[in-house]
Amino acid sequence: MPSSYKLRKKIWKSVYLLITVGILYIGYILIKSGYINEKNDINVTKKSLKDNKNFDLKYNIILKDSIFEGVNKNLNAYKIKTERAIKESNNKYKLDIINAIYNVNQDQTLIINAKEGFLDEESSILDLKNDVKLFFDEIIFNTNDARIDLVNKNITGHSPAKLLYKNSSITSDSFNTKDENNIIIFKGNVSTIIDLSD
């Protein structure tokens, strides 16, 4: 009995040893073949990078809670605050949720709100879209788009506009300002309601 026990023990040890060696060998082959594939992938990537020297790197720079500041031609300051600005190119930004303060002169301030817009810092043009509101003293001005020349103090709009002053109102199809915002010209289907008590 002791010899059969020793024989079985020897056989089991040999089987365990063969299984362990087999597992290690299979692992070695898998690792080696994976390394070769990675090496081939790296070579293919290097080759394709050498062949394609013009890289098309596209990325967006997104600025959260941004402020853009400047002055107009009379050196009155303006400040544009936005919840998000996406840099389109060198000095051009797509803006979301805009709140701006524009000093027309030392005594008068124009407050500007819009849901979206586009700022070109080179030309100092602010294009506003989607629920544009301008507040000037007691005047409220609503439109769907407006283009503001921040330096020359001109505002134009090609969508319907409505000006409210206390109980009076003016509506039109488009508008523009003249003489540094002191004159507003309403164009197309102009309707005026004037309350003389205002």
Curated annotation (Swiss-Prot):
Its main location: membrane. It is found in: Membrane. InterPro entries: LipoPS_assembly_LptC-rel. It comes from the Bacteria. It is a single-pass membrane protein. The chain crosses the membrane at residues 11-31. Keywords: Membrane, Transmembrane, Transmembrane helix. One of its GO terms (cellular component) is membrane. This is Uncharacterized protein RC0660. The lineage of its organism: Bacteria, Pseudomonadati, Pseudomonadota, Alphaproteobacteria, Rickettsiales.
